[in-house]
Amino acid sequence: TITEEHIRKTRQAYYGMISYVDEKIGKIIKLLEDTNQRDNTAIFFVSDHGEMLGERGMWFKQCFFEWSSHVPMIASIPGASKGIRSSVVTSLVDLLPTIIEIGNNSKKEPSIEKLAGKSLIPFISGFSKDINSTAISDYYHIGPCVPTRMVRKNEFKLIYTHGHPNLLFDLKNDPNELKNLSDDE
């Protein structure tokens, strides 16, 4: 049985890891400032997954509920608008075309059109309020876990888990993913 004390200590350890990473990022930014490189350096902070910390009785990362699949992307790019906060759906595949476009001084690079991701520069720069808000993810591990896939399009999320009913959620109206819409007409 998992006790409340176990849950508290696990969450405390997780938040401690976040604080540790935050401190290290602060040191990197200070070094960039001390060497006068901050104004010409793009910084992206992302994670490949979140963590289930007892929500729904689940632990770790092997699912696609929001606690595990929804992670922030923080970008600091010289010349870009500051303080933009958005719930637009992005994906790690969007980073490569974004970085290529930054490296080319924001000139459109024809080769990025062939990449799976989409440059976030129009959005980050404030020129566009919307991008193709789709994210696709999958998880497969040999062992007790079964293949799982997720498609997120705007406020809707579809989760497929082999051998289990599909799950479809409207995250705008059901942010805790409690009402499965997959059988609704």
Give short role names for the model-derived ranges:
Residues 31-84, 88-91:
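Histidine-centered active-site microenvironments of extracellular/periplasmic hydrolases
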Residues 49-55, 93-96, 101-171, 176:
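C-terminal cap/loop subdomain of S1 sulfatases and analogous C-terminal strand-loop tails that border
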